[in-house]
Amino acid sequence: MLLKELSSLASPLSQSQVDKLKQLTAELNSVQLAWVSGYLAATANTSGSAIQVAASVTEAQAAQTVTILYGSQTGNGRGIAKALAEKAKTQGYSVNLASMGEYNVRQLKQETLLLLVVSTHGEGEAPDDAIELHKFLATKRAPQLNNLHYSVLALGDSSYEFFCQTGKDFDARLSALGAKALLPLVECDVDYEAAAGQWHADVLTAVKPLIQTTANVVALNEINSTSAQVASESEFTKQNPYRAEVLVSQKITGRDSDRDVRHVEIDLGESGLHYEVGDALGVWFSNSEILVGEILAGLGLAADAKVTVGSESISLKQALIDKKELTQLYPGLVKAWAELSASSELLALSEDKEQLRQFILNHQFVDLVTNYKLPAEANLDANKLLELLRPLTPRLYSIASSQTEVDTEVHLTVALVEDEHQGQTRFGGASHFLASAQEGAEVKVYVEPNKHFRLPENPDTPVIMIGPGTGVAPFRAFMQERVAQGAKGDSWLFFGNPHFEQDFLYQTEWQQYLKNGDLTRIDVAFSRDQAHKIYVQHRIKEQGQALWQWLQNGAHLYICGDAERMAKDVHQALLAVAVEFGGLSSEAAEEYFETLRSHKRYQKDVY
């Protein structure tokens, strides 16, 4: 309908609004008008996806649009994708940027330029927001993509067996469907920044011959979750963390417990940092001076030797304390050390994937230094040592508080990683740092949003929370938030740990929630308080009929904790409940929980 006719019809717009609309549209060209119409349509339909926002641009300028999709359990993939989109925008490209979870898979056959950033979760699994697209590409419904040029940047951790597996899957499947790779697959380890930056440059160079730039019609379209928007507004990020103050680091396991679990409270002060329940806190830490001293002594290197890290000139000791990863091994380092030490034992071990995986889980760099001495001809000096070690990376902790309850504080539940090996005690880097922190100590932090672990929008929706050990942390935050909301929905907690008397984390809080009626029920499993071990998965099966009824009544289901064993065992228990009490086949049970996941009713925060 023509704008000049608006005022003469029964329009919901006032005359002033019509005049403003006329003034705006008079200044726009046809492509810009298409973009505005798509934007307004998406605004009117808030349930729409990021691709709906960009639909008009895609139709008007399909051959000139670069689509950038990201799939990531944390914010790393989104950060890389967004930085690429900004660079493409400055070069005059029209860009559609979206999470894979918000992308309409039916749009794929219309794409001509597609750039993917995707991480691998768990044991070779796609992250939550990439699952649908990942599965779609593996089905017969996936279209031929002969007109598509693409590139994939895969994020992973070489400490795990299925390194960058999801990225490999996307690359292989797109190629099989006829798409043409702009570049070979780029695989990034945890120190991904340099490789990602190089990919940005390379892929934009590769795109250039295929696209005509039109700087005046650039469109960068993205719909972000609320948490991502809030977090991005803060000046404090992973690269620029806030220097916060430790208020409390208190042991909350008993004196006779085999585990040292700390309740840590941190003051965010005037930082303006905001978090939602379900988010994580990124913690930068310093390695132990004792550990660094042991490494330097074992290598015969001077602590005060001057080295350059980035643009900074510091002592070798300080570089090892603040800049390099010392407490987590990875395959590349073990293999490099095997060659330097010429150890036949270590060389053989590095060629056996399973043995190497177990070795990495149970050793630190100092164990290589101590047990596999370097010959003089290895000639390892300070600079070569730093080249061997990858950069220190922050650790993520599920936040155990709600800002509606604690205001400018953030609470964590931290298990001290502590292992005895050959008569030596080895500590985890971040957990030891936080456990040792005194009141008033400085800690560098930032908020890592996790849109895949969110309470239901309706506070009257029932929730089932499964969190053994420190996996209970986000559920403490959930309960604080639900109480503040005045939630009427039922809530059910499954918790487990070795001993009732020593390891019942936040026991008095849960009892108070029960007494007040905020927590409807709690089922606990203390594995070593009886002859036979009982875990949360056993309690789930025991309460299967009630749990199934809760799910039929619309309950949202949450799991937090260990991904290696617990999450898998709990999932199997849930499948058994669906089979026994829902009358489903094994295949139908899997489909049932997949449907719950796709509707955000089955969410995991596992590590």
From Swiss-Prot:
Q: What sections of the sequence does the record tag as coiled-coil?
A: none
For this UniProt record, the keywords arranged alphabetically read as follows:
Amino-acid biosynthesis, Cysteine biosynthesis, Electron transport, FAD, Flavoprotein, FMN, NADP, Oxidoreductase, Transport
Q: Which NCBIfam families match?
A: cysJ
Give the species this sequence originates from: Shewanella oneidensis (strain ATCC 700550 / JCM 31522 / CIP 106686 / LMG 19005 / NCIMB 14063 / MR-1)
GO terms for cellular component:
cytosol
Q: What is the annotated role of this protein in its UniProt record?
A: Component of the sulfite reductase complex that catalyzes the 6-electron reduction of sulfite to sulfide. This is one of several activities required for the biosynthesis of L-cysteine from sulfate. The flavoprotein component catalyzes the electron flow from NADPH -> FAD -> FMN to the hemoprotein component.
Task: Please report the stretch or stretches of sequence annotated as the FAD-binding FR-type domain.
Answer: 239-456
Any GO molecular function: FMN binding
- Give the reaction(s) catalysed: hydrogen sulfide + 3 NADP(+) + 3 H2O = sulfite + 3 NADPH + 4 H(+)
Q: Which cysteines does the record link by disulfide bonds?
A: none
PANTHER family, per the entry: NADPH OXIDOREDUCTASE A, NITRIC OXIDE SYNTHASE-RELATED
Binding residues for NADP(+), per the UniProt record?
527-528, 533-537, 569
Family, similarity comment: Belongs to the NADPH-dependent sulphite reductase flavoprotein subunit CysJ family. In the N-terminal section; belongs to the flavodoxin family.
HAMAP family associated with the record: CysJ
What does the entry list as the binding residues for FMN?
A: 72-77, 119-122, 155-164
**What range(s) does the Flavodoxin-like domain occupy?**
66-204
Question: What is this enzyme's class at the first EC digit?
Answer: oxidoreductase
Record text on cofactor binding:
Binds 1 FAD per subunit. Binds 1 FMN per subunit.
UniProt name for this protein: Sulfite reductase [NADPH] flavoprotein alpha-component
The cofactor named in the record is: FAD; FMN
Q: Which superkingdom, per the lineage?
A: Bacteria
Q: How does it assemble?
A: Alpha(8)-beta(8). The alpha component is a flavoprotein, the beta component is a hemoprotein.
EC number(s) stated in the UniProt entry for this protein: 1.8.1.2
